UniProtKB/Swiss-Prot annotation:
Lineage: Bacteria, Bacillati, Actinomycetota, Actinomycetes, Nakamurellales
CDD domains: proteasome_protease_HslV
Name of the protein this chain belongs to: Proteasome subunit beta
GO CC term, one of those recorded: cytoplasm
Activity regulation description: The formation of the proteasomal ATPase ARC-20S proteasome complex, likely via the docking of the C-termini of ARC into the intersubunit pockets in the alpha-rings, may trigger opening of the gate for substrate entry. Interconversion between the open-gate and close-gate conformations leads to a dynamic regulation of the 20S proteasome proteolysis activity.
Keyword set, alphabetical order: Autocatalytic cleavage, Cytoplasm, Hydrolase, Protease, Proteasome, Threonine protease, Zymogen
Propeptide: 1-57
Subcellular location: Cytoplasm
This protein's encoding gene: prcB
Cited function: Component of the proteasome core, a large protease complex with broad specificity involved in protein degradation.
Amino acid sequence: MTVDGQVGRWPVSAIPAAYMRPGSGSFTEFLAGAEPHLLPGRAGAQPAGAAPAVPHGTTIVALTCEQGVVVAGDRRATMGNIIAQRDIEKVFVADSHSAIGIAGTAGLAVEMVRLFRLELEHYEKIEGVRLSLDGKANRLATMIRGNLGMAMQGLAVVPLFAGVEEDPEVDPVKRGPGGGRIFSYDVAGGKYEEHDYYAVGSGSTFARSALKKRYNAAADLPGAVRTAVEALYDAADDDSATGGPDLTRRIFPVVVAITAQGAVRWSDDEVGVVAEAVVAGRMVNPGG
């Protein structure tokens, strides 16, 4: 590295003061002080009623099972009455024992997920320990609250967060049969712990109705995944913004399963087998 014609390290005086200032373990707080323009939703204010036409993600479901918790999402993004994308991914592994699904403004939501992942990594590096599941859920609530201005302009992000506590001593009372917990949020950053199952997005009403009929707390992991895909199928059946399994294009829901051993995204081939079984079953019994 060359500084003033000399090869060496950067002088301390060349490092911005914000980078040298002691702070908390929150990367979001650091970024807000050092480079605030890099945070999601920092665009200038829009006139009332002038929200741009942008892709929106739709339906996400989560349910607990005997081994943990499953999060699944359809692959469709819409822009008004247009299908903006058929294979968007809306469910992500957040860290080793949690996952996040997103509904709402797709661009801001994906950016928020990236920042949330970095937030969890940064905290672990700075503090030397990982956040508890409640701590992760609270950090996400703070990030959503920071997007309130954009939400008031029609660019809302509504995530669904789920996971399993890594350390049983931190959370000795298991919420789900396998220790799985589910958190929903409102656009103002309100955090709510859900029990057994939940869904967000435009097709959530239909998905929750399907989960109410099909949910089985004693189901194993494959059974829970089947229930999640069935719920997304029902949502797609009644909600035009939710995409069902596309056997022609081989586009299937994104599924992440979280157990005490960790969070694992199921491959398209694995989900495809489940989706094909669901479609075959609906050929015989369309109502499920």
